[in-house]
Amino acid sequence: MKGRTSTPVTRISSPSLTARLVERTLELVDIASESGAERDIAEHVVAELREGGVPVRDAGDTCMLAGATSRGERPFVLLAGHLDTVPAQENWPGRLVGEGVVGLGASDMKGGVAVMLELALAQAPSAFDVGYVLFGREELPSAEAALGPLLERAQGLCEADLAIVLEPTANVVQAGCLGNIDATWTFTGRAGHSARPWLADSAIDRALTGVGELHARAPERETIEGLEFAQVATATALHAGIARNVIPGTAMANVNFRYSPRLVAEQAELELRRRCEAHGELELLSNSEGALPPRANPLFARLQAASGAAPEAKQAWTPVAEFAAAGVEAVNLGPGDPALAHRRDERVSAEALTRAYEILDSFLCD
């Protein structure tokens, strides 16, 4: 199956393209799709592609495949994106503001999905066989995500020469990604009456000491293939107390460790335990390895040239790691601004949507 036709088509004008991208993004934002509830948006995307004459199939478990699904005689490129969002923060449905879309998922990553859909519907001539991969539950821990199992089921996808994940990057090629551990850190003291604190051993004090030491450690910066990654561990939640007049004997923190792409999961776990276990007990909830930048891939240079900007390291975990685990080299490039992802005022500009389309169209064209 070919991802794009070889029949010449008339390119749409920039104003028309921009309007369609904005309308498409708002349309997608207005379909609620919090992780685990992607059925409506999945059905909508399939219907839109079928109506536009794009070969598409429901691959099960909130996954859809359009265009090419395995390598043919030409190089094989995948465009990939997730359909789900984090929970709403009084920012749904979306709205048009100025020259862009404001609303849940606009940046991460319904703007990117809108670009994917418009590229697929254009069916423009290409130097590649192009496939489109859409999936759900990306915002959940990787063990619950849909992409990894899809790559196991649809082995032809693993023949791709490059996968481009349209995560928010502000239209810069961001290569590689950090590994990601979430863990529960439990601090144990001795409960007591708040009127006699000298008879207790406050777990809050123990937690503050441990978290303070963890946060005092400077990020560890590492250059890989010319790109700088920062390894860092932070506490993202702290819970303690059973009553207002009881000094707690137990406190719990959630620790998030973003680790070097060079580390395997076991090495990262040992490093986090070394940092934490002098103060409390650590229980891992999830551990997902990162991915190294595919700088030697010739398609990387082609995409960078199309973007017109120097590449950056991806200071986050993204599905490029799942592609890498399946043997597919992958990079991130999308219209959203990563600084706006998951924010209450999340948004994406019309200019960024158009620029993302132009970069990918230039990369894919003959």
Predicted regions and their residues:
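A non-catalytic alpha/beta surface segment that caps or lines the substrate-entry region
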Residues: 27, 33-73
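Short, surface-exposed alpha-helical segments at coil->helix boundaries
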Residues: 39-43, 113, 266-270
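Buried hydrophobic packing segments
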Residues: 45, 113-123, 150, 207-210, ...
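Active-site metal-coordination/substrate-binding segment of hydrolases
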Residues: 74-134
